């Protein structure tokens, strides 16, 4: 522990003084920070021991338990009575740092007395005072005045024994890199200055006597610490888990085609199956040798899954450390499916996936069936606002940091510029390329037909001609959700109409994949086809903020379009109301939804497939079937079809949860069915009824209609030509789906001749006079007077 212990009173204080990251012990002032502030600080820390000072703080007992269960190491308290109370409610005494005789007795992990004078507000600790504090705690009895320094990596593996002097320590703190003193050259040794193996300094610690330093570093370059090009001065590390991680990380980037490891990374289903297989074999192994062998196999495949998803052993250990700190734990029972049970008779209906059935006459039941999930806007905005402010303030730097935090990808630049490198199209098959080309062609054809390019001219009075003409929105930002999903359809549904409308700059934004830091080749292909100038490699609220306000490499756009999760939606709503952004959006958004109207003649397999194609989107999707005069046998057949098809789907667990809160609403007439549909205003409306086309005229509110038995929603989602970016959550009552006009604005103009002024001038002056706007009135009066159109003495 260092001689000075920084005390923080704000979430972002550590970012302002990054050299304080070098302290392994941090204290948060509980009187100035809320529980949520502390949890956020812990979440953003870099592995330091974090304690909370409770002097003058007011926390409920439950709040303190939450803090101790989520990364807070100890509580600094002044009262023996309060300490006794905390022990009584279950806090281990080792987690309490109690004030005795003017010093806090710290005993978690190491025994240490912390004098009250050592607790210094972070705001008062400059780089100079922090450095001087470290130097003041160092001791040496060596004749050359050097300090023995043990260098370890972030996994506490010893890299080597070196020496430091006060100058090298000062430089190391200032630059936050590994800098030592070379005895052989008698000079400052900047590690990696010639070899490129630069070290990032993570923390500095003094041993219990203050006569030895420990530098915790992240080794860069080739990973070699020793001049003999080995990982440490004691040779290379044993392979172990960290060696396996390093090997798999290299294989992820360079594994030859056809290799088993390459196959594992490219086939997530195979990797999942192997993990389950090896876990089962481990449970069946009996002797020590077999158990060790099977466990090693399981570790290999588990590590492959970690690497494939950008998760490190450091991430796993961080979770283990947090679990170790928990003082209240789960019961620990296994999930029921993993417990041995006596066989029980399984009834045919057990676990069946069925929709609720309600009558349209039961108003309370109908209201419950059509109620959409509540969106907690205020709570989401509290999380989104700091992200937006960070991007506004720090630009590209914030984008890179937030992408690393939320997407697990460390980028060098947050933007991919056109023309896009050919390697970004690797993996795009000819079959999919043809499918995308067909979809783009159809969407372009339909949206080009919508294009309003001619000027509308109307002579409202003799000599008064009013005109209206379109102009493309100059710069548009198109958000394409990504990460584990591949959504080229969204890219083309937004990009094609923007291209048709003639937008001068089209910017895509999509989060990069954890596996390689790229967006999918399908999205890159669409971006090149529609002329997108760049792809912002970011997702969530940070991507929306970057496009709305602009950064060093992301141009500010005039309108943002595209679907996303609740954070994306909240960010879009924020920027459209911020005059600093001057940015509009396409529409508000909620979970995806479908309403199907069917009758006795409908094919139950078709109806079931339409319901399930929506249910697989997510557990909060809305699936409603409105049945017109359905028989009991028809309802049963529908339920059976839903269950049978659902059980064949890979996302059956999601479907099951969605269908559990989905309903069949029984109506007695088509009129009643369409009245219910119009009240709900669905995103997707599917008509599986006789003479379906005759009923389109009865639809007042819907995002898009799918007419007839052979028109599944999927066609509109991908290739028919209509747009699949549609209003949800009932906004179809006020909004249209994305169309060509979405990317246009319309300007009006008027030309008034002297003849025209004679016809409308008196009306203009009369209205202006009533409104008390004399300057408005004079603008007409002066002109008419000079034209001799006013009678003598006109006032």
From Swiss-Prot:
InterPro entries: Ald_DH/histidinol_DH (IPR016161), HisE (IPR008179), Histidine_synth_trifunct (IPR016298), Histidinol_DH_CS (IPR001692), Hstdl_DH (IPR012131), PRib-ATP_PPHydrolase-like (IPR021130), PRib_AMP_CycHydrolase_dom (IPR002496), PRib_AMP_CycHydrolase_sf (IPR038019)
Positions of the UniProt region annotated as Phosphoribosyl-ATP pyrophosphohydrolase: 226-308
Annotated spans, Histidinol dehydrogenase: 309-795
One Gene Ontology term of the molecular function aspect: histidinol dehydrogenase activity
Species this chain originates from: Kluyveromyces lactis (strain ATCC 8585 / CBS 2359 / DSM 70799 / NBRC 1267 / NRRL Y-1140 / WM37) (Yeast)
GO biological process, one term: L-histidine biosynthetic process
Assigned GO CC terms: cytosol
Residues the record marks as active site: 683, 684
Gene3D superfamilies per UniProt: 1.20.5.1300, MazG-like, Nitrogenase molybdenum iron protein domain, Phosphoribosyl-AMP cyclohydrolase
Transmembrane regions: none
NCBIfam families: hisD, histidine_hisI
Phosphoribosyl-AMP cyclohydrolase: annotated segments: 1-225
PROSITE patterns recorded: HISOL_DEHYDROGENASE
Catalytic activities: 1-(5-phospho-beta-D-ribosyl)-5'-AMP + H2O = 1-(5-phospho-beta-D-ribosyl)-5-[(5-phospho-beta-D-ribosylamino)methylideneamino]imidazole-4-carboxamide; 1-(5-phospho-beta-D-ribosyl)-ATP + H2O = 1-(5-phospho-beta-D-ribosyl)-5'-AMP + diphosphate + H(+); L-histidinol + 2 NAD(+) + H2O = L-histidine + 2 NADH + 3 H(+)
Note describing how the cofactor binds: Binds 1 zinc ion.
Any Pfam family the entry gives: PRA-CH
Binding site for Zn(2+): 614, 617, 717, 776
Keywords: Amino-acid biosynthesis, ATP-binding, Histidine biosynthesis, Hydrolase, Metal-binding, Multifunctional enzyme, NAD, Nucleotide-binding, Oxidoreductase, Zinc
Protein name: Histidine biosynthesis trifunctional protein
Listed HAMAP family: HisD (MF_01024)
EC code: 3.5.4.19, 3.6.1.31, 1.1.1.23
Pathway: Amino-acid biosynthesis; L-histidine biosynthesis; L-histidine from 5-phospho-alpha-D-ribose 1-diphosphate: step 2/9; Amino-acid biosynthesis; L-histidine biosynthesis; L-histidine from 5-phospho-alpha-D-ribose 1-diphosphate: step 3/9; Amino-acid biosynthesis; L-histidine biosynthesis; L-histidine from 5-phospho-alpha-D-ribose 1-diphosphate: step 9/9
């Amino acid at each position: 522990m260092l001689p000075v212990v920084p005390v923080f009173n704000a979430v972002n204080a550590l970012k302002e003084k990054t050299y304080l990251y070098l302290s392994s012990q941090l204290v948060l002032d509980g009187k100035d920070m809320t529980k949520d502030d502390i949890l956020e600080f812990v979440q953003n820390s870099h592995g330091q021991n974090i304690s909370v000072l409770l002097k003058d703080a007011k926390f409920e007992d439950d709040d303190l338990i939450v803090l101790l269960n989520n990364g807070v190491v100890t509580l600094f308290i002044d009262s023996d009575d309060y300490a006794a109370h905390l022990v009584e409610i279950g806090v281990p005494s080792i987690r309490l740092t109690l004030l005795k005789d003017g010093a806090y007795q710290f005993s978690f992990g190491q025994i240490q007395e912390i004098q009250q004078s050592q607790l210094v507000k972070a705001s008062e600790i400059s780089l100079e005072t922090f450095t001087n504090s470290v130097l003041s705690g160092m001791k040496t009895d060596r004749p050359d005045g050097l300090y023995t320094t043990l260098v370890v990596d972030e996994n506490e593996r010893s890299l080597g024994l070196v020496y430091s002097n006060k100058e090298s320590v000062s430089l190391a703190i200032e630059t936050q890199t590994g800098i030592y003193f070379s005895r052989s050259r008698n000079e400052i040794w900047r590690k990696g200055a010639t070899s490129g193996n630069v070290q990032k300094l993570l923390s500095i610690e003094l041993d219990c006597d203050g006569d030895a330093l420990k530098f915790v570093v992240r080794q860069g370059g080739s990973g070699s610490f020793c001049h003999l090009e080995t990982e440490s001065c004691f040779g290379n590390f044993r392979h172990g888990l960290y060696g396996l991680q390093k090997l798999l990380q290299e294989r992820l980037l360079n594994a030859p085609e056809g290799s088993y490891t390459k196959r594992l990374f490219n086939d997530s289903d195979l990797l999942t199956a192997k993990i389950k297989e090896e876990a089962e074999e481990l449970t069946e192994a009996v002797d020590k040798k077999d158990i060790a062998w099977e466990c090693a196999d399981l570790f290999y495949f588990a590590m492959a899954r970690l690497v494939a998803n950008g998760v490190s052993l450091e991430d796993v250990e961080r979770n283990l450390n947090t679990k170790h700190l928990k003082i209240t734990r789960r019961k620990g029972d296994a999930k029921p499916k993993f417990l041995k049970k006596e066989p029980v008779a399984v009834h045919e209906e057990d676990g069946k996936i069925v929709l609720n059935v309600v009558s349209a006459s039961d108003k309370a039941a109908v209201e419950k069936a059509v109620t959409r999930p509540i969106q907690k806007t205020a709570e989401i905005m509290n999380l989104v606002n700091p992200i937006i402010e960070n991007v506004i303030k720090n630009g590209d730097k914030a984008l890179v940091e937030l992408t690393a935090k939320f997407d697990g990808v460390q980028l060098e630049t947050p933007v991919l510029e056109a023309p896009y490198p050919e390697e970004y199209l690797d993996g795009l098959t000819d079959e999919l390329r043809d499918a995308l080309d067909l979809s783009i062609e159809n969407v372009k054809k339909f949206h080009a037909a919508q294009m309003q390019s001619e000027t509308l001219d109307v002579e409202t009075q003799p000599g008064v001609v009013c005109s209206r003409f379109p102009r493309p929105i100059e710069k548009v930002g198109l958000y394409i959700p990504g990460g584990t999903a591949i959504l080229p359809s969204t890219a083309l549904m937004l990009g094609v109409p923007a291209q048709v409308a003639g937008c001068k700059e089209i910017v895509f934004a999509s989060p990069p994949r954890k596996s390689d830091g790229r967006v999918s080749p399908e999205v890159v292909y669409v971006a090149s086809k529609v002329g997108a100038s760049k792809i912002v490699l970011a997702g969530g609220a940070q991507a929306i903020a970057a496009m709305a306000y602009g950064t060093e490499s992301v141009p500010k756009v005039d309108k943002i379009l595209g679907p996303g999760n609740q954070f994306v939606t909240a960010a879009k709503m924020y920027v459209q109301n911020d005059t600093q952004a001057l940015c509009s959006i396409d529409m508000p958004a909620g979970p995806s939804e479908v309403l199907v109207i069917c009758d006795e003649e409908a094919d139950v397999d078709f109806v079931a497939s339409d319901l399930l194609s929506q249910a697989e989107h997510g557990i909060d999707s809305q699936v409603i079937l409105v049945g017109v005069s359905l028989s009991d046998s028809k309802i049963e057949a529908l339920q059976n079809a839903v269950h049978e098809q659902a059980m064949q789907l890979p996302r059956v667990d999601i479907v099951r949860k969605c269908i559990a809160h989905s309903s069949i609403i029984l109506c007695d007439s088509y009129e009643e069915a369409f009245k219910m549909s119009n009240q709900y205003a669905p995103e997707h409306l599917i008509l599986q009824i006789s003479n379906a086309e005759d009923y389109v005229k009865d639809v007042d509110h819907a995002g898009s209609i799918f007419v007839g038995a052979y028109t599944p929603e999927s066609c509109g989602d991908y290739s028919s030509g209509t747009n699949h970016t549609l209003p949800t959550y009932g906004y179809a009552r006020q909004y249209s789906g994305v169309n060509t006009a979405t990317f246009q604005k319309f300007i009006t103009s008027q030309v008034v001749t002297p003849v025209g002024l004679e016809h409308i001038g008196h009306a203009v002056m009369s209205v202006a006079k009533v409104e008390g706007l004399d300057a408005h009135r004079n603008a007409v009066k002066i002109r008419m007077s000079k034209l001799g159109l006013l009678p003598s003495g006109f006032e």
